[in-house]
Amino acid sequence: EDLKKVEVYISQNENPSLQELNGIIGKIEESNTPITRAAAAYDYSKYLPVSEGQLNSKEKQIFNQNPAAGLIVLAQADYANKSEKGVFGSNSWGTNGDAYRHALWNAMGAKGVGDSYMAAFATAHETGSAGYNPNSIDTQMDLKNNAKGRELLKSMKFPSRPPNGMTIPYIIRNEIAKAVANGKMVRFVSGGKQYSYLMPTNSSSKN
């Protein structure tokens, strides 16, 4: 809904300022309000949040620092969720696909909103989650893959004049997939079995 408002405003106003866009979107309630039924039913181990109602309290704080950037981050989360399913056949936890999803989200998000905001949002996604444990294997995995996605973006080469709007996402997606296949990310599930340590990702394309 907020994204539609922004699209309409941009279509009617040439070069709107960030302040104007943030004014249209507005901030979201940060207090610990009861979790909505939709958010409670959302599987955070297999999907990234794609709407304001699915954010934890720490993510909401980062969102409210720059709501326009926050919407971009949520849109890229949706892109990463769908891309994992398209590439690996499903959305999953602890696998190559999970590593791909987090790294892609961070690379795409950093491309859209800058490294520091994306890093803050992605870290809040982990530290603000229910039952957060900094030493848990899944937290360690996500933080490492988030950082790797942002790091890889810095070495990617993009055309100065992309032929169309899908060129840059295509380049980022391919580079992240290549990095996963080449063992640049980490996971703890292999062949359907869960391990107690992190291991490099590999070229297996099925979750």
Predicted regions and their residues:
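Small-polar-interrupted transmembrane alpha-helices in polytopic inner-membrane proteins
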Residues: 115-131
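Structural recognition of the beta-strand scaffold that forms the well-ordered cores
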Residues: 107, 119-123, 145-147
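Interfacial helix-loop-helix junctions of multi-pass membrane proteins
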Residues: 126-143
